Structures are given as C-alpha cells and as structure tokens.
Regions:
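Mg2+-dependent endonuclease catalytic cores in nucleic-acid-processing enzymes, primarily RNase H-like
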Residues: 1-6, 14, 25, 33-178, ...
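Hydrophobic, well-ordered secondary-structure elements that form the walls
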Residues: 17, 73, 197
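Short acidic, Gly/Ser-rich segments with clustered Asp/Glu that frequently serve as metal-coordination loops
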Residues: 18-22
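Extracellular low-complexity, Gly/Ser/Thr-rich intrinsically disordered linkers
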Residues: 166-213
Length: 243
C-alpha cells in the first residue's frame, strides 16, 4: 500500500530496540482480528547512554498518525543501556510505555499475567514469550490475502527491512531424546531489529488486550469514521548528540 491507510486500523503500538549507537522503533497499526499494517520505522542514531537520544525517541512516540496516537510501547531492556531504558519506562508508565525482556522457550505466553519487579529502577518488567510471537509472525507472512492476521507493508520499506524481518529460522535439536525448537539467526551476525521491533509491537498489543481492550470493538468504532490516515515518510534521525 502507499501513503493512505484504510480506516480499519484502530490501534497503534510500538516496539523499541536499543543498540550501542542507536535506537530503532517500529510502529504497527492493528485492525480486526489482528490484521496489521506497518506504519513507521525509525532509526535514531546517537548515544543511548545520555538523555538526548531518548528525547528523540519520546518525540517519535508522542507523534500522531491521522487521528491515532500510540497506545502502548514495549521497550526491550535485555540488551544495551538497560539502566537508561528502565528510567525511560519508569517515567512514562502512565502512557503505557512498558519495560520488557524477551524470553524464548515453549509454553511461554506472548504477554505475562503479571509483571516481575526489576531490581534496577524498581519498575514492572514484562517477560515476553518471543517464540510464540515469532511463530505467529512467520505464519502470517505467508498469508497472501487481506484479512485476519495479514500483515501489510508500505512500498517505501527497503530490502534491508525485509532481510531483517526474515533473518531467523527455527532450529530443532534433541536433548535426551526430546526435540527442542528455538529461533536462531540464519547467518552469524545477521541483523534482526525489524523482526524484534515488530515482535515487541505485537507484544504491546497483547499488553493492551490483557488490560481489557477489545480490538475488534475498537476496529468497528474507528472504521465508522470513514477516514484514511495520511502517513509520514520514514526518517533516519540523527540525534543532536551527533552534531
């Protein structure tokens, strides 16, 4: 699709991944039966150990797309600059900016029934079952028709985005005769931020659902407005730290 988005999109969530020299953020729109549209993808370059880059991220998350603002955000705290990520989430809990940590393995739900409490920052930490989300995402990527579970991408996304989105595969190994499956990079050193941030945005949606949000009802209510969303072009933002 191009720059207009059908009014079936009712809810926006975001996933945030922190790297050593940048923050990447993906905003996903959700409609009936979890039909999804990638709304925006940003690479914010700078130093995550200081406040300026986080201010850039806050500016993105405070934006609006058409009538919609981001309803929930999942920020990965399991990698770089954990302390800064916790502090960012701690001061924005009222906006549903949640600290998360991905965990692989069978049987883990997409979103936990209750958070744990972090030692750093004393804030709720939500353990996300990333394998369950990746299973769902890769199954949905095979769908070729609009409808429940389908994922739509704007034409402006480049090839690197799709390489990252499809950078992993399921590997099955046997331990004491039992098959154990896990998601692994297809190649060593393969970047996968597009996949991770989509997974986190999906997890944020389930965080909202766990709080009682009814996605299909939201989609019906918003669809009645008969409006399309005019989307902004993707940007690569260079933090003021780099100037």
């Amino acid at each position: 699709w191009g720059s207009d988005l059908a009014p079936g999109v009712a809810v926006l969530t975001a996933g945030v991944d922190v790297q050593g020299d940048r923050i990447e953020v993906q905003i996903v729109g959700w409609g009936r039966d979890e039909e999804a549209w990638v709304i925006d993808y940003r690479v914010l370059w700078g130093d995550p150990s200081g406040p300026r880059l986080w201010s850039d991220l806050d500016g993105v998350l405070n934006g609006t797309w058409g009538d919609l603002a981001v309803r929930a955000v999942a920020v990965d705290t399991g990698g770089h600059h954990t302390k800064m990520a916790y502090e960012f989430c701690r001061t924005r809990l009222a906006r549903r900016v949640w600290a998360i940590k991905g965990r692989g393995g069978p049987g883990l739900p997409v979103w936990p029934r209750r958070p744990t409490r972090t030692n750093k920052g004393k804030i709720p930490l939500f353990i996300v079952g990333v394998d369950a989300v990746k299973d769902a995402v890769y199954a949905r990527l095979k769908l070729t028709e609009p409808g429940p579970g389908a994922i739509h991408f704007p034409r402006r996304l480049d090839a690197d985005y799709f390489r990252q989105l499809t950078a992993e595969r399921v590997v099955t190994r046997f331990e004491k005769g039992r098959p154990l499956r896990s998601w692994q990079p297809k190649r060593d050193g393969e970047r996968n931020e597009a996949l991770d941030t989509f997974v986190y945005a999906h997890a944020a949606l389930h965080g909202l659902i766990s709080m009682g949000m009814r996605l299909n009802e939201e989609a019906e209510a918003f669809g009645g407005r008969g409006q399309a969303l005019r989307l902004r072009s993707p940007e690569v933002i260079r933090s003021s730290w780099m100037k």
